[in-house]
Amino acid sequence: MYTRLLQSTTRLHPRAWDFIQLMRLDKPIGIYLLLWPTLWALWVAAEGVPSAKNLFIFVFGVILMRAAGCVINDYADRNFDGHVSRTRARPLASGKIQPREALVLFAVLVTASFVLVLFTNATTIWLSFGGLALAACYPFMKRYTFYPQVVLGAAFSWGMPMAFTAETGSLPPEAWLLYIANLLWTVAYDTYYAMADREDDLKIGVKSTAILFGDADRLIIASLQGLALLCLLLAGARFELGVWFHAGLLVAAACFVWEYHKTRNRKPMACFNAFLHNHWAGLAIFVGIVLDYALR
């Protein structure tokens, strides 16, 4: 139903679907993976009762910035995507959208996001420039380093300190435990994503943690996920979260075990499905946080 609704926009303009695909609005998994951790931080910062204004700002800010990230990513990869089986049909790689049009769209999305941030406070506004820098840099990192997933993790986690400053006007040291947890988790699930493209990436010279980790990939992913859970446990102790939060962590841990099992043969589709499955882990942790505050 969601996809059909998006496809109906072609009635408004024949190229609308191309731009929807460029922003990946037809594939909301990236929105979820960015949204859940941002909401973890917002709920914890507000002790379970975030303001309606901030909830609106961060939900729509996530949607806009994820779309902007996809646009600049495809712009950076436009000469690579045509050589990768999974990405060769993307609008920029296939020529349906021109690079100049993509840059204009990126500027519009970033501007809209910044307008939302203007309704917060000075600290959050200043922090937003760091998020923009990370989002703009990430797509180019795979040309120069085997750690682009770390930059992605930093970018995907940046909304968390912003949520704290928007809600409370301050950034307590323990908030960085949430940030580090999400960074580690992002590196883990995006390595699964990179494993799906590893053979194509090796041919075209693109770098990733999947290539760097080699045969130790699944073991390192499991270790990163374990460290992420440990950071969340420590953060939970500092923020005095209780049984429901810990129940959410247990569900997330079960998700990680399932992913480890399903990727034992390292088949590309299994790795891609493991990446997608992380949405449920993030949701479980969010539900745990919400229930922990709501049922006190």
UniProtKB/Swiss-Prot annotation:
Belongs to the UbiA prenyltransferase family. GO terms for biological process: ubiquinone biosynthetic process. PROSITE patterns: UBIA. Signal peptide: none annotated. This is 4-hydroxybenzoate octaprenyltransferase. Its cofactor is Mg(2+). Keywords: Cell inner membrane, Cell membrane, Magnesium, Membrane, Transferase, Transmembrane, Transmembrane helix, Ubiquinone biosynthesis. GO terms for cellular component: plasma membrane. One of its GO terms (molecular function) is 4-hydroxybenzoate polyprenyltransferase activity. Pfam families: UbiA. It comes from Ectopseudomonas mendocina (strain ymp). It is a multi-pass membrane protein. It comes from the Bacteria. Its EC number is 2.5.1.39. It is found in: Cell inner membrane. Catalyzes the prenylation of para-hydroxybenzoate (PHB) with an all-trans polyprenyl group. Mediates the second step in the final reaction sequence of ubiquinone-8 (UQ-8) biosynthesis, which is the condensation of the polyisoprenoid side chain with PHB, generating the first membrane-bound Q intermediate 3-octaprenyl-4-hydroxybenzoate. Its main location: membrane. It catalyses: all-trans-octaprenyl diphosphate + 4-hydroxybenzoate = 4-hydroxy-3-(all-trans-octaprenyl)benzoate + diphosphate. Pathway: Cofactor biosynthesis; ubiquinone biosynthesis. The chain crosses the membrane at residues 29-49, 55-75, 102-122, 124-141, 146-166, 169-189, 216-236, 239-259, 271-291. It is an enzyme of class 2 (transferase).
